Amino acid sequence: MIMPAKVGIIVVSDDIICALSVNKFLESGNFAPKLLKVMKSLIKFWKSTSLVLKILIGMVVGVVLGLTLPEWSFVALLGKVFVGALKAMAPVLVAVLVAGAIAKAGSGLGVRFRTVIFFYLATTLVAAMVAVVASYVFPVQMTLSEATEGSAPGGLSDVFSKMVHDMVGNPIQSVANANYIGVLFWSIVVGLALKHKAGAQTIEVVSDLAEVVGTVIRWIIEFAPLGILGLVFSSVSESGLYIFTDYGKLLALLVGCMLFTSLVVNPLIIALYLRANPYPIVWVCLKESAVNAFFTRSSAANIPMNMSLCKRLKVDTDFYSVSIPLGCTINMNGAAVTITVMTLAVCHSLGIAVSLPAALLLSLICTLGACGSSGVAGGSLLLIPMACSLFGINNDIAMQAVAVGFIIGVVQDSVETALNSSGDALFTIVADLHSKGKKPADIADLLSGEGKNRC
């Protein structure tokens, strides 16, 4: 009887001591000023810290919460809200920016547009060739067992037929459904009409509307760290780390090809074009664009990030407001790698010998198919059966490769989107620099000046 009594007294005494301490602290009158001081310090730190560092902090917190408290499903809501907000505003931003840019466009944009379109298509083809070579050097097989249900395009004609259909679809529905092919087409048409018929005041209203939408986008981007926190938490809590062991070789080949394209192939092409060290631009685009695209897994959601980066680097608004959304549609380096590697993995698994001419034809088909993947539900993965048909592989077997793609999609799709979307900004900036006679090193001055202005 004595022990419980003593324990009870000790517990009560501890509670009383804690209560007295709290009351004494509150009565001292120092609580509010100290709390206010802490809050001001946190706000000052938040404002002075770069967005990239904030995102990295969000990533770390997301990983920790995902591993330790996976049952906190409400955290994932932060990511869904962030991506949803970006996806909701991005089509509107593209529509008003493109229409306004075309309406105000002067001379000198033609050369840059030709340059950036060449980069988009050429690098996508080279990425497919890199994937072919890597698949020959490091052949990977996958276990093909059960058939997978799903629908995929029957061929290139189906892909481009859908693209044309989407292009001339209802413009309001195109904005509502984030159909960027339709948004681009109708925005260009409206912009041309404004250029020839509208007065200066009307065009200025469109420009003001673009500024308003851009302001809303910037507000959304300020919440990127919380959004990334939610996205990382969702991936870690749902998928864990098992995807690095199952299908590890296939995933390593895919990621390796994409990293090689991003860090070696694209910089080499830019170096030959600019005759200068390309890596100052490459690193900026990877840091400012690829990181966010990796976690949002949506090129469309990353359009505002790319436009914000181009604006900070003094790229002409008339140029980037069209080239960035266009790149979201046809710049598909990562998609070309995915389609090529997965198709050749199926061939290796079935013992199908792929000749060099067939491999080159596959590269071309994957390039054309990848450029249309933004118009296909499921993206690059559902274009795998189309490429497999080149080797006489039936749809049931090819769809099993699609299923494998969805299993490793947490990483594959993230890296693919990062490569695709950061390339949009990269080639836009390169084309603009070349037209102005500047070099990649010049962007360091712009960013350093921006940092001084923030301070």
Predicted regions and their residues:
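Signature of multi-pass transmembrane helix bundles
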Residues: L42-E71, V83-M89, R114-P280, A441-L446, ...
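Short amphipathic alpha-helical coupling elements at transmembrane boundaries
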Residues: A76, K80-G84, V111, Q173, ...
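Hydrophobic transmembrane alpha-helical segments of multi-pass transport and channel proteins
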Residues: A85, L121-L125, M129, V255-L259, ...
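Juxtamembrane helix-boundary/capping and inter-helix hinge elements in multi-pass membrane proteins
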Residues: I102-V111, H196-A200, S239, R275-P278, ...
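Membrane-interface alpha-helices at helix entry/exit sites of multi-pass transporters
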Residues: G110-T115, T215-E222, R312-C328, L356-P357, ...
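Helix-loop-helix junctions within the multi-pass membrane cores of secondary transporters/permeases
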Residues: E288-A370, A441-G451
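Transmembrane alpha-helical segments and their short flanking loops
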Residues: V341-C455
